[in-house]
Curated annotation (Swiss-Prot):
EC number: 2.5.1.112
Keyword RNA-binding: no
Coiled-coil residue windows: none
Protein name according to UniProt: Adenylate isopentenyltransferase 3, chloroplastic
Record membrane topology: Lipid-anchor
UniProt GO BP: cytokinin biosynthetic process
Top-rank taxon, per record: Eukaryota
Function summary: Involved in cytokinin biosynthesis. Catalyzes the transfer of an isopentenyl group from dimethylallyl diphosphate (DMAPP) to ATP and ADP.
One GO CC term, this protein: nucleus
Length: 336
């Protein structure tokens, strides 16, 4: 049996852990601008290659603290193709609010600038509700653009805790292959077929850029002319291409994280999840290893990060201004 590593154990009791309450601001809202040297608000960023368990860890952290999750996967921002893009399911999310997940039409383009603006609005919205923002996703270039903006606004306003869920590449390669097979069993071929447009072979925009969509082009255009044996052979080649492209993506994502840590000197806490994946044939053993090696240590890291300095953010409802700004940004992304 193939265990889905990103599945959160919603129904199992969690070990005792701190619950974060943001205290009221010491100086009042009008004094914040007059106290630029005061404590910053806190943001957790979870990074990692595709398939390493980022979503699972984000939910684990969010259910142990008062937190909400902000997606940083530029493909998952779009609506549709939930299997192909491996979006977190309602069951897996355990009731934790997720932002910027499936909010744009499939054909909409999302630039790094668009994403940064939307992410900043989401962070403000989460903080205004007295919650901890957790940014999670595989689009490291967008995360870099958000955190290291040219004006240094992000780092001047927020303290960041960077967690990197890492898996040894040979082990991850095997898991990625199994995950693609599992996606096929879950209906990936049928899902892509519903989106496929014989009159349009442009895969450079929107959700059609997702790995697992353009690879099917030759299959759908030729399957009606093939016998059963040739059809299965072609499908097998398509799936192998998807597996290869997914693993190559994982390698690039890992290289980008290494660059951020070594070249740009980001303080990134690496969490090795390799032993979890080597135990994936036994769900119980894998879950125990996950808690001991990944979720538990990450919870401790976040606890120390949050208890370092109290947040300056008062407990207030999200402002209508933030909500309106988000609506405007979503509308801008719809412009072709």
């Amino acid at each position: 049996m193939i265990m889905k590593i990103s599945m959160a154990m919603c129904k199992q009791p969690l070990p005792p852990s701190p619950t974060l309450d943001f205290p009221p601001a010491r100086f009042g809202p009008n004094m914040l601008t007059l106290n630029p040297y005061g404590p910053k608000d806190k943001v957790v960023v979870i990074m990692g290659a595709t398939g390493t368990g980022k979503s699972r860890l984000s939910v684990d952290i969010a259910t142990r603290f008062r937190a909400e999750i902000i997606n940083s996967d530029k493909i998952q921002v779009h609506q549709g193709l939930d299997i192909v893009t491996n979006k977190i399911t309602s069951e897996e999310s355990c009731g934790v609010p997720h932002h910027l997940l499936g909010v744009l039409p499939p054909e909409a383009d999302l630039t790094a600038a668009n994403y940064c603006h939307m992410a900043n609005l989401s962070i403000e919205s989460v903080l205004n509700r007295g919650k901890l923002p957790i940014i999670v996703g595989g689009s490291n270039s967008y995360v870099e653009a958000l955190v290291d903006d040219k004006e240094n606004k992000f780092r001047s306003r927020y303290d960041c805790c960077f967690l990197w869920v890492d898996v040894a590449l040979p082990v991850l390669h095997g898991f990625v292959s199994e995950r693609v097979d599992k996606m096929v069993e879950s209906g990936m071929v049928e899902e892509v077929r519903e989106f496929f447009d014989f009159s349009n072979s442009d895969y450079s925009r929107g959700i059609k850029k997702a790995i697992g969509f353009p690879e099917f082009d030759r299959f759908f255009r030729n399957e009606q002319f093939l016998n059963v044996e040739d059809r299965e052979e072609l499908l097998s080649k398509v799936l192998e291409e998807i597996k290869r492209n997914t693993f190559e993506l994982a390698c690039r994502q890992r290289e980008k994280i290494e660059r951020l840590r070594k070249v740009k000197k980001w303080s990134i806490q690496r969490v090795d999840a390799t032993p979890v994946f080597t135990k994936r044939r036994s769900k119980m053993d894998a879950n125990v290893a996950w808690e001991r090696l990944v979720a538990g240590p990450s919870t401790d890291t976040v606890s120390r990060f949050l208890l370092d300095i109290a947040s300056r953010r008062p407990l207030v409802e999200a402002s209508t201004a933030v909500a309106a700004a988000m609506e405007r940004e979503l509308s801008r992304c719809l412009v072709a």
